[in-house]
Amino acid sequence: MMKENINDFLNTILKGDCIEKLKTIPNESIDLIFADPPYFMQTEGKLLRTNGDEFSGVDDEWDKFNDFVEYDSFCELWLKECKRILKSTGSIWVIGSFQNIYRIGYIMQNLDFWILNDVIWNKTNPVPNFGGTRFCNAHETMLWCSKCKKNKFTFNYKTMKHLNQEKQERSVWSLSLCTGKERIKDEEGKKAHSTQKPESLLYKVILSSSKPNDVVLDPFFGTGTTGAVAKALGRNYIGIEREQKYIDVAEKRLREIKPNPNDIELLSLEIKPPKVPMKTLIEADFLRVGQTLFDKNENAICIVTQDGNVKDNEETLSIHKMSAKYLNKTNNNGWDYFYLFRNNNFITLDSLRYEYTNQ
């Protein structure tokens, strides 16, 4: 039975079948979905390391289906529910490997999801192909999709660029598998979950495509990596998991998380600057007619004119056209390019807009 208030679900783990539990969630109430569904690996026999030891791969009951027809039907059902509960401005990430990601992509396109990117998780420490019978499978693929082609969605471009040394973040992420202290073990010292994802992967997913206080849902919650990262970043989470042993691990893990997002994680870089025309700054005495503007190297470039434009030795232009001229570009943001000298210091022209707004 569907509930009407999403607040009833926030920061909880729902125990049960993912499709049935998804049906209880209100329409268009989720900002971001991360799904790590069964891969339908179809592994047979034992996997042996080169030294003869048995390798503990994915051989769980939840990854077993009779055939592709059953698997496809299952995926179509949970994806339909995800589309129903996703906000029009939301997005969904689905991760998979060569065994399933192409089938899932086909289903998602048939359901009118719009693929924004296929992001490659390049594993820096992949599990080798022990038999030497084919290439080492060193990556997984994530499909990042909006609800429909024309829908807007959250993408924190400036934040991700800043964290990538001021270069555009790319669609290939080189990250290690979940190992060491991060890998959760059971009482026998074995892996608590065979496909636990690293927090670094979910960090990029959640930070890039959600905002503080957004609702992040994971229909295959496992040991709670999605919830742990969401909570740490100041987002709300909802998990769905059918096995109590995983829920117990996830709940313990989540209790230990103390949200403490920094300014970057709170998306300070995504705040749009106030719209204040140059002429307004002149009228409010934040700028003077005839005042000199400089570039970052403290070279005098132009002076401010009465109408809010700027003038060099040749012509009068807007701050944007003037900065583009000196950079040999077609267009440029003049607010970021120009500086002025005030109180024995060079300050950015852009800072005046904030001073004016905050006065």
UniProtKB/Swiss-Prot annotation:
SUPFAM superfamilies reported for this sequence: S-adenosyl-L-methionine-dependent methyltransferases
GO CC terms: cytoplasm
Alphabetically ordered keywords of this record: DNA-binding, Methyltransferase, Restriction system, S-adenosyl-L-methionine, Transferase
EC number from the UniProt entry: 2.1.1.72
GO terms of biological process kind: DNA restriction-modification system; methylation
Molecular-function annotations in GO: DNA binding; N-methyltransferase activity; site-specific DNA-methyltransferase (adenine-specific) activity
Catalysed reactions listed for this entry: a 2'-deoxyadenosine in DNA + S-adenosyl-L-methionine = an N(6)-methyl-2'-deoxyadenosine in DNA + S-adenosyl-L-homocysteine + H(+)
Pfam families the UniProt entry points to: N6_N4_Mtase
InterPro entries named among the record's database cross-references: DNA_methylase_N4/N6 (IPR002941), DNA_methylase_N6_adenine_CS (IPR002052), RM_Methyltransferase (IPR001091), SAM-dependent_MTases_sf (IPR029063)
UniProt KW Methyltransferase keyword: yes
Domain RAMA: 275-358
Similarity field: Belongs to the N(4)/N(6)-methyltransferase family.
PANTHER family xrefs: RNA METHYLASE-RELATED, TRNA (GUANINE(10)-N2)-METHYLTRANSFERASE HOMOLOG
Name under which the protein is recorded: Type II methyltransferase M.HinfI
The organism of origin for this protein: Haemophilus influenzae
